């Protein structure tokens, strides 16, 4: 886990028990291209946990009978699955090239990947051009399906709109008195969308509150003392941040000693990944999100119990939300493949049949129920959860946990996030 790869192609081939009348070696593996950060600042908190989740899923699925029903069949409808894992580091141009390589050289059947919203925006039209089913597992910008229609591109996890709408709802409900707010977000699609959604919702709920400062930083900047000084000097009551990965960890490390979290109520919409690595640095009262019902907010169901047990056998750190997003997306792929088979294990469904099976579907996962109800059936919605940190007997715990139903924090089909928020969530 400590090894860093600048460019890695790791292939894991695990054979499953064949269905009656067939030998495992006669079955052509179903190849899944997995794209996640294996190097750089996002690798530790995001990429490596996601990679572990993918490997755990492959091992358990190929063994057969390990997952709860209806996911207990070996492989994908009897076919063993093979992972081709590559590094997401390097920027959008590199990722477009890597996607073409996965399809044209590695001959993958589907692609599961991408944490960066910039990467998702770049690869989506290329995946459509290549007619390769591509499941976006973690990026959050709602623009993917609001600005284009896709036949082959899906996102079986929710957008960041619900993160930030729910953040504003949570602040409005739990902070009785506040007059000012500020933000520190990354200056690209993810951070811009997150800030606009949070501020727009907050202003619709409390039009009298005033912005003190909005700090937009370069992705991966690493040093935030100038921005922290600007925020502290503006003395806001509420601070919103959608920082993730290494940027999030840097903000916590640099902000906590300067009382950034003491002088205001701070809400970290993607803060859950930091609680395992920085539990002692996160002050009590910090509002934390996990980009859905993931990690510490995941429901008690058979799929979650399976996942936690299998993951913890492979890692010293509990699964965080990038791990949940990865396994949820792989659940979607298995669900769609086997639905497209229609119970005929000898059938090899086409890409188009698998895509049709996932469009508009509802399936179960370690994070609960997932509905593909936006983006003409290609975009998922889920509930959103927030809670406040509190140290109890030396351990970080959560209080004031509130769960928001999917329909309360996601726009209706046919309406963009911006339109919905501008219309006061109506």
Short names for language-model regions:
Residues 52, 93, 108-214, 261-291:
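Extracytoplasmic ligand/sensor domains, especially the bilobed periplasmic-binding protein
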